[in-house]
Amino acid sequence: MIMSKDIATTPELSEPDKYFVEQRDLLLQEITSTLDSILNNLNGLNISLENSIAVGKEFESVSELWKVFYDGLANGAAPGVAAANPSSQDLPTEPVAAHQNAAAGNSDAPAPSQ
């Protein structure tokens, strides 16, 4: 708290001057308390921002994993997945309908070649 000279001990000040000094001291006290409040609120904001940044950093690895997954889908396959998928050479060349008709017992359908 900033205080000027004690008004009661200074007899040379006139009444308007005393009033001015009192009002100035009140304003300085109000400004000081407001600045303290602003500083405390800024510290709270800083802590909140640091916490949100920390949470964001915790999700970086998850974000990177999803990025690799998405890039793999965009490129057709993720690295190392192409070997696990059957190629078109491994697929049977007969139509699927022929197998379904034979299983249903339709005699009109050609028998599957083996």
UniProtKB/Swiss-Prot annotation:
Disulfide bonds: none
Domain of life, per lineage: Eukaryota
InterPro entries: DASH_Dad1 (IPR013958)
Region (Disordered): 80-114
Location relative to the cell: Nucleus; Cytoplasm, Cytoskeleton, Spindle; Chromosome, Centromere, Kinetochore
GO cellular component: cytoplasm; DASH complex; mitotic spindle; mitotic spindle pole body; spindle microtubule
GO molecular function annotations of the record: microtubule plus-end binding
Principal place of residence: nucleus
GO biological process, one term: attachment of spindle microtubules to kinetochore
The entry's keywords: Cell cycle, Cell division, Centromere, Chromosome, Chromosome partition, Cytoplasm, Cytoskeleton, Kinetochore, Microtubule, Mitosis, Nucleus
Quaternary structure annotation from Swiss-Prot or TrEMBL: Component of the DASH complex consisting of ASK1, DAD1, DAD2, DAD3, DAD4, DAM1, DUO1, HSK3, SPC19 and SPC34, with a stoichiometry of one copy of each subunit per complex. Multiple DASH complexes oligomerize to form a ring that encircles spindle microtubules and organizes the rod-like NDC80 complexes of the outer kinetochore. DASH complex oligomerization strengthens microtubule attachments. On cytoplasmic microtubules, DASH complexes appear to form patches instead of rings.
Job of this protein: Component of the DASH complex that connects microtubules with kinetochores and couples microtubule depolymerisation to chromosome movement; it is involved in retrieving kinetochores to the spindle poles before their re-orientation on the spindle in early mitosis and allows microtubule depolymerization to pull chromosomes apart and resist detachment during anaphase.
The family this protein is said to belong to: Belongs to the DASH complex DAD1 family.
UniProt name for this protein: DASH complex subunit DAD1
